[in-house]
């Protein structure tokens, strides 16, 4: 690769797609990973109606569209829509020709093999990229925090996972995955707001609730105590103005919603909370590296952006770990984008340049080359 041709870094999340150029310190484009199609044919007479809309445009026209997320729980489930999202990323958001740039994509840990093969195939065959690479999201987050050893608790919109990493390599036997993330919390908030008498049901209204969640929710350090405070005073109540001007008030829902991360039983799920999952992940690792993992627990992803989450993690993991263990939870302020930032760092390294899968290698070996070259 000549120096002047920047690689493209695309972090395809279940909720948001983050894209930009390697070497930049933040993504240039961040937009919802959604494809919208008109609910009724021909409603928008004379608007030059398109058969599909992507990202922010789909979001702004959501009233007349059915919105679909092609990535569920971190895994691509609809490849036609995924292709639309990539097309939109390259041509509309970044305004680049993909055949001129190497492309670094990200994927969830423990992704099915067929998934990354398909990604590889689409990049080379549909977009004709000269080179590409698929990196594991959590590993990139760790790089972004300036470490090569640690455990990453990465929680986005569609999936949460704990990934222990030693000297730059993820330890697959100890990776744990939890299908509980931001989208589930949004749905849960919709449900508990309904109990308060507010009604949110459509895909468009779900986006409003997501906004309420992002602006008003927080994690309680002590849930029972916080419930007591909420019951005895109105000090925790906040109001929110809906798009139509109606104002709603929200109280204990503010911390009941993200509490589900620590108590999945709130959602009717029989899994361990994020604190216990992190601990279990550490316990699956060699006894000699556990100390390094406890001292380098890195939070990453948009669902770790709740105020109070780091303190609560510290408290919960301290309760589970041996009493003398030093525990440090690292919550970088830019953790919403740390996967992308790590990708930007990785793709700019001179040592990384021989790691790319080239078009030539792809033509010789086919999509399975991705398992040999990307880890």
From Swiss-Prot:
Signal peptide: none annotated. SMART domains: ACTIN. There are three different beta-cytoplasmic actins in Fugu rubripes. Oxidation of Met-44 and Met-47 by MICALs (mical1, mical2 or mical3) to form methionine sulfoxide promotes actin filament depolymerization. Mical1 and mical2 produce the (R)-S-oxide form. The (R)-S-oxide form is reverted by msrb1 and msrb2, which promote actin repolymerization. Keywords: Acetylation, ATP-binding, Cytoplasm, Cytoskeleton, Hydrolase, Methylation, Nucleotide-binding, Nucleus, Oxidation. The modification N-acetylmethionine is found at residue 1. The modification N-acetylglutamate is found at residue 2. Widely distributed. Not expressed in skeletal muscle. PROSITE patterns: ACTINS_1, ACTINS_2, ACTINS_ACT_LIKE. The modification Methionine (R)-sulfoxide is found at residues 44, 47. This is Actin, cytoplasmic 1. Belongs to the actin family. The gene is actba. The modification Tele-methylhistidine is found at residue 73. It comes from Takifugu rubripes (Japanese pufferfish). It holds the Pfam family Actin. Its EC number is 3.6.4.-.
